[in-house]
Amino acid sequence: MSASAFNFAFRRFWNSETGPKTVHFWAPTLKWGLVFAGLNDIKRPVEKVSGAQNLSLLATALIWTRWSFVIKPKNYLLASVNFFLGCTAGYHLTRIANFRIRNGDSFKQVIHYIIKGETPAAVAAKQTASTSMNKGVIGTNPPITH
């Protein structure tokens, strides 16, 4: 590629509607950090991966991937980053679901775990602890006499 052809291509990129002088370039470029963080989470134990966070990332990825083809100018960089963000979030949600099902949870329990982040045993333990604490507190204080 000759120098003049390179200069022309660079100038066209620099001054384009989705070039580095616009938010249409920088927002998707910086959003790749979320994709790389999701890829790094593959090494984390599945118990440490947040279902609610990945569900949110999947939802935003689906919405913004579609939106990037609707807006003018079409933003393929935004579409690509959101597509891969959705892929990593979907992968983590699949990991969580498979892990919970292997541990004996039903589909309903898996959905509850993804949204709330609590296992049924943890919910039951929390309810037991709160009822036992309430039994010990209510009505046990002696009356105040002066």
Swiss-Prot record:
Phenotype seen when the gene is deleted: Grows more slowly in amino acid-free medium (SD), when combined with disruption of MPC2.
Alphabetical GO biological process terms: mitochondrial pyruvate transmembrane transport
Molecular function terms, GO-annotated: pyruvate transmembrane transporter activity
Alphabetical keyword list: Membrane, Mitochondrion, Mitochondrion inner membrane, Stress response, Transit peptide, Transmembrane, Transmembrane helix, Transport
Stretches that traverse the bilayer: 23-39, 55-71, 78-94
Membrane topology, as annotated: Multi-pass membrane protein
Signal peptide (residue range): none
Location of the transit peptide in the chain: 1-20
Cysteines joined through disulfide linkages: none
Main location: mitochondrion
Localization per record: Mitochondrion; Mitochondrion inner membrane
GO CC annotation, single: mitochondrial inner membrane
Family per similarity comment: Belongs to the mitochondrial pyruvate carrier (MPC) (TC 2.A.105) family.
Note: Present with 6750 molecules/cell in log phase SD medium.
Quaternary state and interactors: The functional 150 kDa pyruvate import complex is a heteromer of MPC1 and either MPC2 or MPC3.
Its job: Mediates the uptake of pyruvate into mitochondria.
Protein's UniProt name: Mitochondrial pyruvate carrier 3
The organism of origin for this protein: Saccharomyces cerevisiae (strain ATCC 204508 / S288c)
Gene that specifies this protein: MPC3
